[in-house]
Amino acid sequence: SEIFIAGLLKEIPADVKYIVVSEAGASIYSASKLAAEEFPEFDVMQRSAVSIARRLQDPLAELIKIDPKGIGVGQYQHDMKQARLDEALGGVVEDCVNAVGVDVNTASYSLLSYISGINLASAKNIVKYREENGEFTYRAQLLKVPRIGAKAYEQAAGFLRVPGGKEILDNTGVHPESYEATEKLLALFGYTRDDVRNGNLKELRGKVTKAGSAKVCEQLG
């Protein structure tokens, strides 16, 4: 297939390129209950094709829909106790999702369910709330979602992003509890919210290191 496509592109005058995407686990997804739920009118081949294409757009969001064992994590994975393997692989997926964070306005419930403090039921409620009320414009709106209480919100807030929302810090990894300290840190080094919005904080870490982390913490109280 790759040789055919490469040869075909040579005959096209426009600047067209191709990208190779791993199809590992795509057949597992295409035959899953989730795939049938997402694409009820598609056959398994079409679902598989969509899954592979989506991996190019957002790899993490798509790969979490597949049992990690189906992706192939080593030739000896079946020699381990399956319960222990599931726990280990699930932990890695959860760590990855929380390290990256997710857009609360576009994430599927399957992706949201990996966020700390959110289970499958509350993840589905977030999607339902979003469909009925429109996009979230700030993190605290999550408290209006059924099954998202104060404790769950506290655990999840820092991992959920709200691009284009009313509060620029809602689109960062900063937890709401640390917003005040963040404001002080920005002001201390001459930055503003616009710098956060425009991604002009590349030198901030170096400035903090130069000033001394302990001293900066003392100044911030």
For the regions a protein language model found, what residue spans apply to each?
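Charge-patterned, long linear interaction tracts outside catalytic cores
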Residues: D58-Y129
